[in-house]
């Protein structure tokens, strides 16, 4: 959905800290992404996949994001999702949002990964990212 425009600067800072002997925690320098309905206070929007929330900048990190950053993890970006985390209707394709389009499997572009956290799952499943956060609304965690 979107990449953190500051990710390279953040990673360079963490690399310098490690070289100086400082390690923030067990996830120091490990990249992760979050589903685009999870708040992160940086230069990315939190839109839940909807054009209606374009420009939405939240005032603070979600608690889980703050904890991961404190442990040294690097927020690489936001993953696509089913618009509004699947809370619109049951009559549309899972993994689709107006803003991000249809999420596809990295191994078979004709396959819908399913669930509202499809972008997070597809990214981890394709080994594009070490780990990702999703949310359970209507089948994502199954």
Indicate residue ranges for each PLM-predicted region.
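Gly/Ser-rich catalytic/binding loops embedded in alpha/beta enzyme cores
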Residues: 1-138
């Amino acid at each position: 959905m979107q990449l953190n425009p500051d990710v390279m600067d953040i990673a360079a800072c963490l690399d310098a800290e490690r070289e100086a002997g400082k390690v923030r925690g067990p996830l120091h320098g490990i990249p992760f992404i979050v589903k685009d309905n999870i708040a992160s206070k940086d230069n990315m929007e939190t839109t839940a996949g909807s054009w209606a929330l374009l420009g939405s900048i939240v005032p603070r990190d979600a608690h889980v994001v703050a904890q991961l950053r404190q442990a040294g993890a690097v927020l690489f970006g936001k993953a696509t999702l089913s618009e509004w985390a699947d809370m619109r209707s049951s009559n549309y394709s899972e993994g689709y949002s107006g803003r991000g389009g249809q999420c596809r499997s990295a191994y078979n572009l004709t396959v819908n990964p399913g669930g509202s956290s499809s972008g997070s799952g597809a990214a981890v499943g394709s080994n594009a990212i070490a780990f990702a956060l999703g949310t359970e609304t209507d089948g994502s965690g199954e």
